[in-house]
């Protein structure tokens, strides 16, 4: 297992790397989000990006998809340096990606069929007969062909997530990006989504990035895992390698302990001094 951002770069052939995040630095306001962050996503594999809340996991996806630009370092996707691409080129690159967000983001005023058909109608000029075939095929793949005429309000959370997944794959993407796909799901729905992620990756020949803090779920499907903390990759390897790590940060994250390098309390003045100070201030007023 590697436990530094520099060492996290796997020695994979260039044509085997779909996304290469190299020595990236990124700030929001005066806050450093990433400092020399490096991650590689290899073709045909499921790569898990994990870390405590607020470590910038979703921000990394925004950088990869060109929604934000790095301050330093470089991100290449299929060999294209994102920072050098025009808006039109980034748009074209995104056509090769599918994205599944934690809230599903279904359009509430159209039915399931039209939600899945939406990207096809927006980005292609396919005949209606072919759109129908493609939509029903993708809905069948996620087990919801029979729900094509339902409205989003009639769906459970797990069903809505599956509809969103069908929509994400309807354009036959090469790279599928999942941002917190397990949030709010019951155990059965969670198991279904895990199964679909694995089967989609294998059956459709996809490359997948899964951002989540659900350690045990990711361990069942991920080929490669990166743990981000403090703006850097603190550990990388297979899920089994992370589980066997001796790093205090990794152990705390993997076990869910409140005792470790990631503090429970937000930085604050001395407790007693602050209480006494507030009390005296109140009396003076």
Where does each model-flagged region fall?
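Conserved ABC ATPase "signature" region
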Residues: 81, 128-146
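Conserved catalytic motifs of ABC-family nucleotide-binding domains
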Residues: 172
């Amino acid at each position: 297992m590697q436990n530094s951002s520099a060492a996290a770069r796997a020695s994979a052939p260039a044509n085997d790397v779909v996304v290469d995040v190299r020595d990236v630095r990124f700030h929001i306001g005066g806050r450093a989000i990433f400092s020399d962050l490096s991650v590689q996503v290899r073709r045909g594999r499921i790569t898990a990006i994990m870390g405590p809340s607020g470590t910038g996991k979703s921000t990394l996806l925004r950088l990869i998809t060109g929604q934000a630009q790095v301050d330093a370092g470089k991100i290449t996707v299929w060999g294209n340096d994102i920072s050098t691409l025009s808006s039109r080129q980034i748009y074209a690159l995104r056509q090769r990606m599918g994205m599944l967000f934690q809230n599903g983001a279904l359009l509430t005023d159209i039915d399931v069929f039209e939600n899945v058909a939406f990207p096809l109608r927006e980005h292609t000029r396919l005949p209606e007969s072919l759109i129908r075939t493609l939509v029903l095929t993708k809905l069948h793949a996620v087990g919801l062909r029979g729900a094509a005429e339902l409205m989003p309000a009639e769906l459970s959370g797990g069903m809505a997530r599956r509809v969103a997944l069908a929509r994400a794959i309807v354009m036959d993407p090469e790279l599928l990006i999942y941002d917190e796909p397990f949030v709010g799901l019951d155990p059965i729905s969670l198991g279904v989504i895990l199964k679909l992620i694995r089967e989609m990756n294998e059956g459709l020949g996809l490359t997948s990035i899964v951002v989540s803090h659900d350690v045990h779920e990711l361990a069942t499907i991920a080929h490669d895992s990166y743990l981000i903390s403090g703006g850097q990759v603190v550990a990388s390897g297979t899920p089994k390698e992370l589980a066997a790590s001796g790093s205090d940060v990794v152990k705390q994250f993997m076990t869910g302990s409140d005792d470790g390098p990631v503090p429970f309390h937000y930085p604050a003045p001395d407790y007693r001094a602050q209480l006494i100070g507030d009390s005296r201030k109140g009396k003076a007023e």
